[in-house]
Amino acid sequence: DETKKVYPFDFAFTVTQKLSGRTVTVIWEVENTGEEDLYFSVGGHPAFMIPEQYDIVFNKDLRNHGETELEYVLIDPETAGVDAAHPRKLSLINGKIPYTRTLFDEDALIFDNTQVERVGVEVDGKPYVTLTCKGFPSVGVWSKPKADAPFVCLEPWIGRCDNVGFDGELKDK
């Protein structure tokens, strides 16, 4: 089996998608079918077509709190690892930031440490799409860098690419 050559674990991975009204629920189930500890990461890659002007909205509890900040990290283009040694701050007003053409010029904004429980898009102050990601250690938000792409990706991750300089084992990720 090709997977076993690069990922030597016995497992079953099931994705269930349910549609109920205007809500899509996605359930990931990872089952260890072997005897050894199972080390894994999993993340979604949902992209949403959006209008030209929109706001990105974070965590419902940040609404009406004036100015707040979230910490994010970027992927180092030279190593393809996360530059966790140089976190940045994203300033929000009432839990949101307007999209600007330069927002994703340095690639994905990666929010670690379960800071983001909900992220979405508002258009003209009205909810357009919302992703609930409570319990996910990391969330990536991005669109095509240096372009006015007609989409935004809101990605929940259990695990992400390594930090710059990491050379440990899979079990240490």
Regions found by a protein language model. Give the residues of each.
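Acidic, contiguous internal or C-terminal segments within carbohydrate-active enzymes
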Residues: 2-40, 44-46
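Active-site pocket scaffolds in enzymes
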Residues: 127-173
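A short, polar/proline- and glycine-enriched secondary-structure boundary/capping micro-motif
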Residues: 5-8, 35-41, 51, 67-71, ...
